[in-house]
A protein has these predicted regions:
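Juxtamembrane "anchor/assembly" segments of surface/extracellular structural proteins
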Residues: 1-54, 89-95
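Short, acidic/charged, Gly/Pro-enriched secondary-structure junctions
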Residues: 2-13, 45-80, 105-124, 154, ...
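Short, surface-exposed beta-strand/loop "edge" segments at domain boundaries and coil↔beta transitions
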Residues: 12-17, 48-52, 68-71, 93-97, ...
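Short, solvent-exposed secondary-structure boundary/capping segments
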Residues: 76-91
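Charged- and aromatic-enriched interaction segments used to assemble
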Residues: 89-179
Length: 179
């Protein structure tokens, strides 16, 4: 079975159109652990066209996942005589470096209201939630990922609960994300 995925150079953020190079990997897989790690892996052969040369750290790959077409950032690559393997993570994880909560205080808010406040510092990110629980949390000098998924008592998951689903630059934290 032929797999075709799109690769975007690190500086290309136009994900609405075709990427800079279509890849034809031997395999591409996504592994997600509920409220845990999300990883993708690709294995690409050394091909005559030189597609494998485009696989570089910080490039973005668009591939099909269990929850639709998703964007993943290449975090690590390794080359062998047979090909290139790469480890990727959801682009939402970019928020570790570019969505900082200097002093954010969702006070007596439900899940959706809290996520709206938490994602306000960087409009690239958004959140969805059906959680009706009313709670309060204070986030000072935290990145968005720490604030939502961190192990501290004040994290979104510890205050409001829920299950996490990453969907490109949107995070869904619902009572349940599965069936």
């Amino acid at each position: 079975m032929l797999i075709r995925i799109e690769l975007y150079k690190p500086e290309n953020t136009d994900y609405e159109h075709n990427g800079d190079m279509p890849l034809l990997p031997e395999s591409a897989s996504v592994k997600a652990i509920l409220n845990g790690s999300w990883k993708a892996e690709i294995q690409h052969p050394i091909d005559e066209e030189g597609r494998w040369k485009w696989i570089e750290e910080d490039a973005v790959v668009k591939l099909e996942s269990f929850n639709g077409t998703q964007l993943f950032r290449i975090k690590k690559k390794a080359k062998s005589d047979a090909g290139v393997s790469a480890e990727l993570e959801p682009v939402f994880m970019d928020a570790i470096d570019d969505c900082f909560l200097l002093d954010i205080r969702p006070t007596e808010k439900n899940g959706q209201q809290a996520l709206d406040i938490m994602t306000a510092p960087n409009k690239k990110y958004s959140g969805k939630s059906n959680i009706k629980i009313i709670s309060t949390a204070y986030y000072q000098t935290k990145n968005l990922i720490e604030a939502i998924c961190g192990e501290e008592e004040n994290s979104f998951l510890n205050r409001w609960g829920g299950e996490v689903l990453f969907d490109n630059y949107t995070i869904t934290v619902n009572d349940r994300v599965g069936i």
